[in-house]
Amino acid sequence: MSVVNSILDQIQLPRMVRVRQKFDETMLDDIPGEVVRQLSRTEIASQIRPGMTIAVGVGSRGIHQIDVIVRAALNYLKACGAEPFIVPAMGSHGGATAEGQREVLANYGITEVSMEVPIKSSMEVVPVGVNEDGFTVYIDKNAYEADGIIVINRFKPHPAFRGRYECGLMKMLTIGLGKQQGAQVCHTEGFPKMARNVEMFARCIIKNTNLIAGLGIIENAYDRTMELHGLTSEEILDQEPALLLKAKKNIPTVIPTRLDVLVVDQMGKNFGGDGMDANVTRRFLVPGMEPDPEGPACVVPLSLSAESHGNAMGIGAADTTTRRLFEAMDFEATYPNALTAALAGSVRIPMVLDSDKHAIQAAVRSVWGADPARLRIVRIPNTLHIEQIEVSEALLPELRDRDDIEILSEPYAWDFDASGNLF
C-alpha cells in the first residue's frame, strides 16, 4: 500500500494529554454476601427445595467478577439442598455452537471445575408457548427441563433500541435463553419493534416456565458492582424498568463531545454486544436510532479482544481500522451474530490500513473541514473502561476547569513503534 501510505504519512497528528474522568465510585464491598442476602429473601428462598434441579443462566458479557457472583449463587443453592447447573444464556454468541458458548464462559473463569457444578451447553431449544403477537417462543431445552430457572445479568441501556426493558433480565430470558433460534425469532421484525418483542417474549417465558428468580446487577461507571437485586418473576416485570433507569445514570461516558476522531484501542463482545457500546461512542448502527449530534465524525477501532473469539460484531460502526483487527476476525463467529440480529450493516468492513498510525491518519483525512491546528481527538482503551483516556491538546481549554476531569500529564507525541503501532 505504498501509494496509500505516502498520502497518509503527510498527515500530522496533534499532541495528546492523559486525563482522568471522574464518576460516582459507589460499589459493593461484599459481593458474595450480597448475593446470598438477595437470594435468601423469603419470596425467593421459599421456592427453592432440597433435591430440585436449577438451571442458572449465565451470559457472554464482561461483567466484573461475574465468576464470583455466579459461584456465590451456586454455593447458596447447594446449601439449600438444590442441584444447580449452569446454562450458557447468550443467544447466538460463541459462534452459535455449544462448544463455543462453553469457551465464552471459560474466558470469564466459569468452568465445571471452578464452579463445581455441571455446565449443560447446547443449542437445542423447545417451544414454550405463543406470545400475543403470534410468535412461537423458545428457550434452552436444559433450562426448560430443570425444576427451576435463575438468570443472572447486568442492567444496561441497549445500543440499538430504547424501551422499558433493554439489557437486563427480561432480555436474558428472551435472547439469552432463546439461543440462536429464539433470538432469531425475536429479531424477525428488526430493532424498531425490539422493545415490544423483548417484553412479549419474556412475559410468555415467565408465564410458561418455572422461573424462580433473576439476579440483576447494576455497575458503576468504573465497571464495578454497585448494586445486586434478587427479583422474583413478578418483581422482574415490575421493578426492572426503574433499575434500568438507575443503571443508565451510572454508565460511563466520554465527557468531550463533537469529536473529529474517536480512537478505540480494543473492541469486543466482552465490552458490549456490538463490540463498541454505542452509548459510549455515540455511533449507532441501527436504522431508526437517531444520529447523535454530539457523536464523533470518525470511529477507529485498533484491535479485537481475545475474549471475542474472532466475533467482530459492530465493526460496521467503524470508519477505518487496522489490518491487525481485520485479520483477527472470524467470519464464522461474526456472521451468525449479525444474521440472528438481522443487522448486515453491523459487520460491514471499513477501510483497512496497515498500522494504527495510518488508520488514525486516514480518519483525520476523512473529516471534512477539520482544522489541523484544532483537531478534536480522544483515545480510549475500550468502551467499558474509560476512567483514564487521552485527549488532543485542543480539548484542554474546555476540560481544564471541570470538576469531573483531572489533567494527568503534559502534552506528548503519539508513541508509535517502528511499525506504526501503539501496542
Role assignments for model-derived ranges:
Residues 1-33:
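N-terminal amphipathic/basic leader segments beginning at the initiator methionine
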Residues 282, 288-423:
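C-terminal non-catalytic interaction/assembly regions of soluble proteins
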Residues 53-62, 85-90, 378:
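Short glycine-rich or small-residue beta-strand-to-loop segments that form or flank ligand, phosphate
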Residues 64-83:
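Histidine-anchored nucleotide/phosphate-binding helix
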Residues 39-55, 78-79, 256:
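Glycine-rich phosphate/diphosphate-binding loops that line cofactor/substrate pockets in enzymes
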Residues 226-279:
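A conserved active-site cap/scaffold subdomain adjacent to cofactor or substrate pockets
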Residues 135-225, 230-235:
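Divalent-metal (Mg2+/Mn2+/Ca2+)-assisted nucleotide/phosphate chemistry catalytic cores
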Residues 100-164:
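An acidic, phosphate/nucleotide-engaging active-site surface
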